[in-house]
UniProtKB/Swiss-Prot annotation:
NCBIfam families named in the record: ruvC (TIGR00228)
Native source species: Chlamydia muridarum (strain MoPn / Nigg)
Pfam families in alphabetical order: RuvC
Subunit: Homodimer which binds Holliday junction (HJ) DNA. The HJ becomes 2-fold symmetrical on binding to RuvC with unstacked arms; it has a different conformation from HJ DNA in complex with RuvA. In the full resolvosome a probable DNA-RuvA(4)-RuvB(12)-RuvC(2) complex forms which resolves the HJ.
Highest taxon in the source lineage: Bacteria
UniProt protein name: Crossover junction endodeoxyribonuclease RuvC
Catalytic activity: Endonucleolytic cleavage at a junction such as a reciprocal single-stranded crossover between two homologous DNA duplexes (Holliday junction)
Position of the signal peptide: none
Keywords carried by this UniProt record: Cytoplasm, DNA damage, DNA recombination, DNA repair, DNA-binding, Endonuclease, Hydrolase, Magnesium, Metal-binding, Nuclease
InterPro entries: RNaseH-like_sf, RNaseH_sf, X-over_junc_endoDNase_Mg_BS, X-over_junc_endoDNase_RuvC
SUPFAM superfamilies to which the protein is assigned, alphabetical: Ribonuclease H-like
Needed co-factor(s): Mg(2+)
Length: 170
């Protein structure tokens, strides 16, 4: 049976998400993808509530085995880092309330899994993911967040077996 993995690229204005199906550890197929658009005119608290509500609905409908997020990283603007961290918290809570396992990877780890180099640009990730999964729609300028979400899900598909091995050795 195939495992369904959800990658999420969090944001305070756009949150990209993508689902992949993984069979026999190596066969990866795209399942579905999209983005949650949040209005800049809304107060931050309302955006977080909308993000929580929409992601909870998606999680309930799709019931993935795992949710994958980027680890927190520090922006040049400390306020942006804090706001993004709160969005990540909302996403972690939504998955946790539905008893879905959450995994986190550094952005450079996800880029390396998708492109082969950890310092790849967003456009390089977008191009490679669209080619690997044969999804031409990802090449649109406003789909970088979705491509990043696919890269995170693919990263977990590749690294999860090694995490299980690591746990068994400890």
């Amino acid at each position: 049976m195939a495992d369904l993995i959800m990658g999420i690229d969090p944001g305070t204005l756009v949150c990209g998400y993508a689902f992949i199906r993984v069979e026999n550890r190596y066969q990866i197929q795209p399942h579905s993808f999209g983005k949650i658009k949040l209005s800049q005119k809304q107060a931050l608290s309302h955006r977080y509530r909308q993000l929580f509500t929409e992601i909870s609905t998606i999680l309930q409908r799709e019931a993935p085995k795992a949710v994958v997020l980027e680890t927190q990283y520090v922006h040049k603007n400390p306020q942006s880092t804090i706001k993004l961290g709160m969005a990540r918290g909302v996403l972690l809570l939504a998955a946790s309330l539905q008893d879905i396992s959450v995994f986190e990877y550094a952005p450079n780890t996800a880029k390396k899994a998708a492109v082969g180099k950890g310092n790849a640009s967003k456009q390089q990730v977008q191009l490679m993911v669209s080619k690997l999964l044969n999804i031409q729609d990802l090449l649109a300028d406003d789909n970088e967040d979705i491509a990043d979400a696919f890269a995170l899900a693919m990263c977990h598909a590749h690294l999860a077996p090694y995490q299980d091995l690591k746990k068994s050795l400890l």
